[in-house]
A protein has these predicted regions:
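Long, contiguous binding/interaction regions
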Residues: 1-43, 47-78
Length: 78
């Protein structure tokens, strides 16, 4: 299963390996489709591939870390 999300990172998480930790912990393959990172915030379109339960747990994990997560429906322009 592949699902896309828009992630918004607060300043204190920009340099933290949140995506790596989630992917490793929940056996998810992340694919960064688009990203914009500045000194004060980060925004990313992330495609996650894995089991439905694992993706759900991974999203809950990064949300608990302080990342704002929104489901992206439909196609993203490349």
């Amino acid at each position: 299963m592949k699902t896309r999300f828009k992630l918004t990172f607060p300043q204190n998480l920009i340099k933290e390996p949140v995506i790596f930790t989630m992917a490793k912990k929940y056996d998810i393959i992340p694919n960064i489709r688009r990203a914009k990172i500045t000194a004060t915030f980060g925004e990313m379109i992330l495609e996650l591939e894995g089991g439905e339960d694992n993706i759900q747990k991974g999203i809950e994990f990064i949300s608990q870390q302080g990342v704002d997560v929104e489901l992206v429906e439909g196609d993203i322009l490349e």
